[in-house]
Amino acid sequence: MVLHDGREISGNVILSDQESDLAVLKLNSDEVLPYLKLRKSDTVEVGELVLAIGNPFGVGQTVTNGIISGLARTGIASGSAKGYFLQTDAPINPGNSGGALIDISGALVGVNTSILSRSGGSNGIGFAIPADLVGQFLIQAKEGRTSFVRPWAGMRGQPITFEMAAPLNLPAMSGMIVSELHELSPFSKVGIEVGDIITKVDGLDINSPAEMLYRMSVAGIGTQVDISYLSKGLTRTKKVDLVEMPNSNVKDIVLGPKLIFPELHISELTPEFQSKFGLPFSSKGLIVLNTGRIAGRLGLRSGDLLQEINGKPVETIEEAISAIGSIKSNGSITINRSGRRIALRFRL
């Protein structure tokens, strides 16, 4: 790391997160260095003056100014469903990513992360990770974690649209309707059901799944949040435990050269794979992680849900190996791809 006076200090990455492209570094120095205070994100207002600090195009430390253009922007960076950002018109160019976005008192408002641009340069639409979430990165780093862990909701939902508000007897487009719940979901455990409308987390309005996940992430794993929701016409509030995604002893396998689909990498289903590939929580089968050459030529793709081999349902690695081993000449594989059931036939 290069300091403002030109000195270089080495450091190590102690925590990182691919989803947000953010990391925590530990500098190899005993010197007490200047630091920024974190601004409470819910106090940031649209129109507020901010400064973006970075090293655009490698020209050196640069400061640009602008305002907060918007709050609660979601699904911006690489189409991330987990993204939740502050929007600014302060010029942000390649090299500014990871730089500080500060207010006029010098407090950290956010960390610059991305821009929307057709040319690759600044068009006045930049985004920053809110300081509240940055603070959780620091907390987890101090706890000894090496990768950032978000609380697991085990729930899917969708924002309330204008067309949905009237039939649901809602006064405005606010909240999100629960469309699916995992059997182990902490929301399900407190009695929240499909069709309920979640309106607040810890008293703060939410309008999308990404906003709810952000509120949960800021609260942190191991805590509780108050979830306010509408159920059967009544407003209720329940305390929900914030937990990690269940980590069962799941099995996976890369098929060997003696089997008919060498290099095919399949795994039993987990909540992580269901979330990553957008599969319903009720899905059954094996997830394809890598096709290998032969299965790829047959038409399999990474992310396919392998459900039947030669007409036999498969949910475990043992069932898959047994079904594959029983194939003598002609065979078939049934997969689910983006909700479509597809049968692939082959001959040995």
Identify the function of each model-found stretch.
Residues 2, 12-14, 31-59, 93, ...:
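Active-site substrate-binding loop(s) of clan PA
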Residues 21-27, 88:
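A generic structural motif
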Residues 18-21, 339-340:
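Short acidic/glycine-enriched loop/turn segments that link adjacent beta-strands
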